Structure formats: structure tokens, C-alpha cells
Regions:
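Acidic-and-aromatic substrate-binding clefts and catalytic sites of carbohydrate-active enzymes
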Residues: 24-25, 105, 253
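Alpha-helix-loop-beta-strand connector modules within alpha/beta enzyme cores
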Residues: 67, 71-92, 139-162, 205-222, ...
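Active-site metal-binding loops of divalent metal-dependent hydrolases
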Residues: 21-22, 226-228
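N-terminal capping/small domains of soluble enzymes
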Residues: 1-95, 101
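Alpha/beta enzyme core
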Residues: 31, 35, 102-223, 232-242, ...
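Short gly/pro/ser/thr-enriched loop/turn and capping motifs at secondary-structure boundaries
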Residues: 47-52, 129-131, 193-196, 252-254
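Alpha/beta catalytic cores of nucleotide-metabolism and tRNA/nucleoside-modifying enzymes
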Residues: 217-218, 223, 229-285
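Conserved, mostly hydrophobic/aromatic
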Residues: 18, 41, 80, 97, ...
Length: 285
């Protein structure tokens, strides 16, 4: 049974990864989670200099979810390179570094610094909604999305994932802009907007199918995220066309979520005698 997926030439042992900002840089969860079981660890955002983050309180529970405004607090690239990369290299999982910045130059500085480090991919965060400078300004203007993507690609030695903001009128426009700028992969929230898939029948749960932006709108691999807490959630995203999934908020209330989801996908494949997880990707159209 094959659970491996490939993103921009990088092979992951399974399609389950952590969502940036919900898993630290791996060490924080390593007592609960065998990081070797994950397709990839996506680190918390890393900037060129330390960021203090937003004032407290930063987190509030709401019905059905959680509000957070951490502000991308991080110790900066120097500490990350010395402390976090050596820790992650102990594990048999891919390392994806989330890069944040306030200007194009900030992003480029981090990308260049990571060029010779043993990391597998870069995720460029232009989607964070709670930093007053940078982040969201890039993510809401298609010309800016294309420009920052092109600049990052020009300086990057690793494949580039562009993490897009959901807070736009049409995320397809932003996705196409990132594609035009040379992105290798996209991270997208709400891939399944307004859609429910019956994973047992592998078809839409209702006849009047509708959905988000997975499919032919862009030709790049998509990492789906947003509300993934169970294997069934992950399978829906895969069947809708996501090449991999990121697990976020679920990590806060269930530190075992990522491994449980990976195991759940394997159990589903055994139950339905599916030899290759890639057979599930985009199987519902």
C-alpha cells in the first residue's frame, strides 16, 4: 500500500502535514507525536529578525472554533537555524519552513539564508490576517502576489509553496497570480467551501454539487487546509483535489490529531482495498 505523495519533486511519506503556527517547530509536540509518522512538519513563521508578536490576550474560544492573533511571534532566522533545524533533522520527515516578512526584502533575506540549509521546501506566508504590515497586504492584491512570488522564486533554492489568504473576493485570481509568478505549490484554505463529499461512495453528498477552488482552475499541486480534524475531513480534501493536507487548530485540543489522521487514511485505504493514495486525489469531480 502506497501512501506517498509528491509535491514539486519532494516525496512525502504520506499527505499529512502540520499547519504553520499550530505545531511550533516540532519540538513542542515531540513528546506526544512521533514526528517520523508525518509527511512533513511545517514550522511556525520565521522572519529575518525576532518578532515580539501581538499584545495579550491573543487567543479566544468561540462556538465552533478559535480566534487567534499571535502576530507571528518568532525568535528570528538566526535562532531558527541554530536551534530548530538541527532538532528537526533528527526525524525522518520533510521540513517545510514558513517564511514571513513585512517587505519583499525581508522575505528574500530569509529565503537566501535558508538556501544552503537542509530544509525541503519553503512556505511563503502572505496570508496572515493579524500583522498590520506585510502579510495581508501582499495577499490581497494579485499583482503583489505575482510580484512577491516571482522575487522569492528568483532567490530560492528549494521549491516554493505560496500560502494564500482566504480574505479575498476570489481566491482563484490570487492562485493564478501565484502560478504566474512561478509558485511550485499552493496552500489554500476553504478548498471545500459549500461542499460535502460522501467518502464511502466517493461522490458528492448532494446532487447539486458546488465547491471551492480545487480542480482545473490552476495546474499546481494544492495543500488543503481549514477545519481538518479527522481522517474523514482529510479524505474529503484529497478527493476534492488536494495533493496533501495541513492540520491546524485540531493540534491545540488533540495533540495526536496528525498521527490519527494519517492512520485513519491508511485504515480507509485498507478497508476499500486502495493500493495508492494518489488514486483518491481528485477522484470526485
Amino acid at each position: 500500500m502506497n501512501t506517498k505523495v509528491t509535491l514539486a519533486g519532494v516525496e512525502l511519506k504520506n499527505p499529512v502535514m502540520t499547519a504553520s503556527g499550530t505545531f511550533g517547530s516540532g519540538a513542542e509536540y515531540s513528546e506526544f507525536v512521533d514526528l517520523n509518522r508525518l509527511g512533513a512538519v511545517v514550522t511556525k513563521g520565521v522572519a529575518n529578525v525576532p518578532w515580539p508578536g501581538n499584545p495579550t490576550p491573543r487567543i479566544a474560544e468561540v462556538h465552533g472554533g478559535m480566534l487567534n492573533a499571535i502576530g507571528l511571534q518568532n525568535p528570528g532566522i538566526d535562532v531558527f537555524v541554530k536551534r530548530d533545524i538541527p532538532f528537526l533533522k533528527q526525524y525522518d520527515t520533510k521540513i517545510i519552513v514558513n517564511v514571513c516578512g513585512k517587505t519583499t526584502e525581508d522575505y528574500i533575506e530569509v529565503v537566501e539564508r535558508l538556501g544552503d540549509e537542509p530544509v525541503d521546501m519553503l512556505e511563503i506566508n502572505i496570508s496572515c490576517p493579524n500583522v498590520k504590515e506585510g502579510g495581508i497586504a501582499f495577499g490581497q492584491d494579485p499583482k503583489a502576489v505575482e510580484a512577491i512570488t516571482r522575487e522569492v522564486k528568483r532567490h530560492a533554492k528549494q521549491p516554493v509553496i505560496m500560502k494564500l489568504s482566504p480574505n479575498v473576493t476570489d481566491i482563484t485570481v490570487m492562485a493564478k497570480a501565484a502560478e504566474a509568478g512561478g509558485a511550485d505549490v499552493l496552500s489554500l484554505i476553504n478548498t471545500l467551501t459549500g461542499m460535502k463529499i460522501d467518502i464511502n461512495r466517493r461522490t458528492f453528498a448532494i446532487a447539486n454539487k458546488t465547491g471551492g477552488m480545487s480542480g482545473p482552475a490552476v495546474k499546481l499541486p494544492i495543500i488543503g487546509m481549514g477545519g481538518i480534524a479527522t481522517a474523514e475531513d482529510a479524505l474529503e480534501f484529497l478527493m476534492a483535489g488536494a495533493a496533501a493536507v495541513s492540520v491546524g487548530t485540531a493540534n491545540f485540543y488533540n495533540p495526536y490529531a496528525t498521527v490519527e489522521i494519517a492512520e485513519g487514511i491508511e485504515n480507509y485505504m485498507k478497508k476499500y482495498q486502495i493500493d495508492d493514495v494518489n488514486q483518491l486525489i481528485g477522484c470526485v469531480k
